[in-house]
Amino acid sequence: MSDVIRLLPDSIANQIAAGEVIQRPASVVKELLENALDAGASIIRLDVREAGRELIRVTDNGKGMSQSDARMAFERHATSKIASFQDLFSLRTMGFRGEALASIAAVAQVELLTRRAEDELGTRLTINGSEVGEVATVTSPLGCILCVKNLFYNVPARRKFLKSNETEFRHILTEYERVALVNPQVAFSIYHSGELVQDLPPSPLKKRILDVFGKRMEKDLIPIGMKSPITNISGFVGRPDGARKRGALQYFFVNGRFMRHPYFHKAVMAAYEAIIPQGTMPNYFLYFDLEPSQIDVNIHPTKTEIKFSDEQAIFKLIGVVIREALSSSNAVPAIDFDRKELIDIPAYQGPGKNVVRPPVDLDPSYNPFKETGLTEPIRSSRRQSPDMGWNELFKQFEAKRDAEKMAEPPIRSEELFASTDFTPSAVSATPSTDMLCYVHRGRYLVTTLSRGLALVDFHRAHKRILYDRFMADESRRHIEQQQLLFPELLEFNPSDASAVKAAVDELQSVGFDLSPLGVSSYSLLAAPVQIIDCAADVVRDVIHTTLEDGRSSHEQMLELIATQIAEYQAIPCGKTPTAEEASDLLAELFASNDSTYTPDGKLIVSIIEEADIARRFE
């Protein structure tokens, strides 16, 4: 029997390895940008076409490569970053494995043009699917120009699973922003199909954040900083009032590298506990700088998951530095007063006249204890209690109470507990003020049904009602629009702007009027009348949710917009409704076709069956 185990050719092995490193066009962008930074570039330009399917080109002014290095760079595990295993624990570069270029060349058509400062001529190299084509000496600018064309051209299955151009370009922008945020000293620019999307000049860190995400964040950023033997922490955190339900900007960086770290995220959220509304997320940009030997980057192909030697200590430091920053910036109300800010008010000196003491006449013969004004002396209530007639007093009280009871008709249990069925057909659509309900802890309504007791979350119930009203108005084309007194400027990063373009028709159809002002800015001119005061927040939440969920159809967008409008218009949690409001809300809720769940699938009503209640008293 012949042997069945064989060694794979390098081309196939590279394609398999590319599956871990190169997952989509954004993966190529990440690797090429990091290579440019490792080469010492101070100016980096990124060009993409068809969201990276046709072309990804990175141009930099870095060190460049010799012809032999250019050829060797596309071999598997060829790197200039390490020479021994111990070098892994002293890395300051972004790349080190020598897998990226080989993986890219295995699934795309690659062209490299490079030149070093000491060389008069440069090198042009072409590779198609791991096969080296032309290697020539040509004129070339300083640095590197690396073009990746027709990604996954030889792996149709991988190309088929790519998402839409809008989705893939958003992923590219995400990787681009991560690299730009951690390298503010480098100039970046990105072009899509020849059109400039974003141009970032070298700048301080705060300005780089504002250039990427918009100037509206300026008032939200609080600087933080701490130096310790374990790690240095710097960056910015958001004010509590800037916390969002969706689309919060949350970034961790360590030694110039973006990372994900759920444990450190918990530390940030713990620092904001009780000072931001439940369900919201703060913005933060945290930068860690520590010895490379204290972290392990080599645990994931994308190098975004990093282990720390002392994570618990860093967890505590994160909480300390954020709380100090929030406290010192007056973002959190403090109990102590700042005496440095007190106004020095001089003591009142008067008009300058001497105050004359008024004359007082005394009657030396007056004795206030001589006469009491009572006909009889005061007796001790403890010793003389029978004389006060308490028994007679209680007898009179009980007789009066019994007389009032006899005058009132007896209350029957059928009248005390309403028998409302929990079905739309059993309840009139007209709100009734006769429905009995009890407000529990300012959030839940307790009412009676024929099946038992119903516990209703009135915030969610109101949200359901408002959603149904809006959808009914939309179906009748009866949405009332109102112009804003002053148009509101909405600034987005490029990824948000592309989502607005995709959703603008849907927003226009339901009463919003958005006028484009540039690549990533819009003017909000009008909105549905019921949410005119929070229209900008609704638009932002709709866009962020679209980015996260990828909703694109008319029905999905309409449901999303209606849900967000209902969320902002609903009675807030903690605000107790009046008895009439609660009764009307229950009547309208039970008349709805779907009164059990909110539009986003959260439970509204929980029923305690009559049998369960009886069982508790057996």
UniProtKB/Swiss-Prot annotation:
PANTHER family in alphabetical order: DNA MISMATCH REPAIR PROTEIN MLH, PMS, MUTL, DNA MISMATCH REPAIR PROTEIN MLH1
InterPro entries linked: DNA_mismatch_repair_CS, DNA_mismatch_repair_MutL, DNA_mismatch_S5_2-like, HATPase_C_sf, MutL/Mlh/PMS, MutL/Mlh/Pms-like, MutL_C, MutL_C_dimsub
Molecular function per GO: ATP binding; ATP hydrolysis activity; ATP-dependent DNA damage sensor activity; mismatched DNA binding
Role, per record: This protein is involved in the repair of mismatches in DNA. It is required for dam-dependent methyl-directed DNA mismatch repair. May act as a 'molecular matchmaker', a protein that promotes the formation of a stable complex between two or more DNA-binding proteins in an ATP-dependent manner without itself being part of a final effector complex.
Gene giving rise to this polypeptide: mutL
HAMAP family, per database record: DNA_mis_repair (MF_00149)
Matches recorded under Gene3D superfamilies: 3.30.230.10, Histidine kinase-like ATPase, C-terminal domain (3.30.565.10), MutL, C-terminal domain, dimerisation subdomain (3.30.1540.20), MutL, C-terminal domain, regulatory subdomain (3.30.1370.100)
Signal peptide: none
Protein name: DNA mismatch repair protein MutL
Entry-linked CDD domains: HATPase_MutL-MLH-PMS-like, MutL_Trans
Stored SUPFAM superfamilies: ATPase domain of HSP90 chaperone/DNA topoisomerase II/histidine kinase, DNA mismatch repair protein MutL, Ribosomal protein S5 domain 2-like
A Pfam family per the record: HATPase_c_3
Family note: Belongs to the DNA mismatch repair MutL/HexB family.
Domain of life: Bacteria
One GO process term, biological-process aspect: mismatch repair
Assigned keywords, A-Z: DNA damage, DNA repair
Gene Ontology CC: one annotated term: mismatch repair complex
